[in-house]
Amino acid sequence: MKKGFTMIELIFVIVILGILAAVAIPRLAATRDDAEIAKVATNIQTLISDLGAYYTSQGKFATKTSGESTSVDIPAMTNVSNPVKAKTDNCFEVIGPSTTSGALEVTVGTAGLCSKIWELPGLKSVNDSLTTTDNKKYLKFGGIGIDWNK
């Protein structure tokens, strides 16, 4: 007598593997999204922290001049890429310096996973602290604008 699996036993194994795959794959996708949200949230907080530390130590932001325009030199102040993206969506981007001392113009994206990122408690408070003027959002650093050089 030959020993081996019957056709019915093999079909049952295939069905069980299919059920396990149907349950595991959506959970794996959700875990990947959660990991992406955590990574982006950490990058945004690190970017803001690095910019604040640079502004506190130097009293100004690093800038670079290209022709007649001046922009903020993000790579000189942090290793976090600008804009901060969740997959392909921009969640946070530093646009440039504002006319107000110690403030940067920023954009906050809410597409895709970005909407979930801004619901996190730490980043919700950051989003709430942004000031809006003329439909532009600004992130304020430093104190009340005291200039010790005068």
Regions found by a protein language model. Give the residues of each.
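Membrane-proximal N-terminal amphipathic helix
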Residues: 33-62
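N-terminal single-pass transmembrane signal-anchor helix
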Residues: 1-29
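Helix N-terminus capping/helix-initiation residues
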Residues: 31-34, 111
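Short linear sequence motifs
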Residues: 5, 21, 47-48, 131, ...
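A general marker of short, structured functional hotspots
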Residues: 1, 8, 24, 50-51, ...
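Periplasmic/extracellular, small/polar-rich flexible segments of pilin-like filament-forming proteins
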Residues: 53-150
